[in-house]
């Protein structure tokens, strides 16, 4: 997706007849837009505005509005919030100095993330040993499924740890734009392994149901061991999930998702094994099948989510609006028009492409300074990995890049 602005209708201008000769002044524009927006709101919404924090208006609870009206006002509020974020960002970046306290907090956070990964890996080793013993003692296929899950947890944890280490060591001559894409690739491999496990368990459980061969019932001692090991494993995974879920690191959050998944599979596996032992044998493989389906659906979704991030999907309109506003604010009066603002995923973060029109007689030195400062500001945004700013003296031309639909045959 891209946003195109021709000279006849420059961005944020409401006066079409003045568009060719006048570009809107953006200084104080957010305040003006906020005032106009709130002044035009229906009375039923204006009465709910908090004077101290008007942008936190909860439109969803407003009575008497249709759903599409609520959606419209929510989008307008979100746009105003994003513009305010840009203003705050520009103000902070202009005053920014290296803060030793911030650097220390950043180092502490990275250390905490590495600790979370290491604790998760050691916990997976310990739990695998416990579950192997529980499987041998109980003979339950549902517990065996949970044990296989722990085995793959250990393997997948190794993949994520390798991914983390690989991202830290970058040869800029071999990988000139870094190795951030290793992260979604590692998560895809991790999720694919987990989904494969689910399919394998599904086959084994279905085979046991079809063959109609019930497993032997567990005695009192076996049940005690089963309860002790599975409940301990569940408690450990629950603590790890709580510890990891608040992290901002995507790899640590992948660990957190796995820990949450293990809590669910451990509880369901234990319930299925105990009920099968007490009542009907087929409850055990049935529980294993349910776990397998949950595994396949859960991790297949993770595969698709990360795969999409690697194929260049466009940023949503809200992000494009925010970027466009930043371009107009940062560029100053020398930018005649914004021709294109394009943002797309290339891993976790966005790549941004901007085409702007500058005066034809502007000296190269000044034009370069405008483009470079705009690129730097765009790349300072937390959601942007890399920005490309193209300078032109007119915007009436064909697209400068073609989109390939096939791979050339000579490659």
From Swiss-Prot:
The keyword Manganese does not apply. Its main location: membrane. It is found in: Vacuole membrane. Residues 1-115, 162-184, 244-262, 309-390 are cytoplasmic. GO terms for biological process: iron ion transport; manganese ion transmembrane transport; seed development; seed germination. GO terms for molecular function: manganese ion transmembrane transporter activity. InterPro entries: Cation_efflux, Cation_efflux_CTD, Cation_efflux_CTD_sf, Cation_efflux_TMD_sf, CDF_Transporter. It holds the Pfam family ZT_dimer. The chain crosses the membrane at residues 116-136, 141-161, 185-205, 223-243, 263-283, 288-308. The keyword Amino-acid biosynthesis does not apply. GO terms for cellular component: plant-type vacuole membrane; root hair. Keywords: Membrane, Transmembrane, Transmembrane helix, Transport, Vacuole. Residues 137-140, 206-222, 284-287 are vacuolar. It is a multi-pass membrane protein. Involved in sequestration of excess metal in the cytoplasm into vacuoles to maintain metal homeostasis. Belongs to the cation diffusion facilitator (CDF) transporter (TC 2.A.4) family. This is Putative metal tolerance protein C3. The lineage of its organism: Eukaryota, Viridiplantae, Streptophyta, Embryophyta, Tracheophyta. The gene is MTPC3.
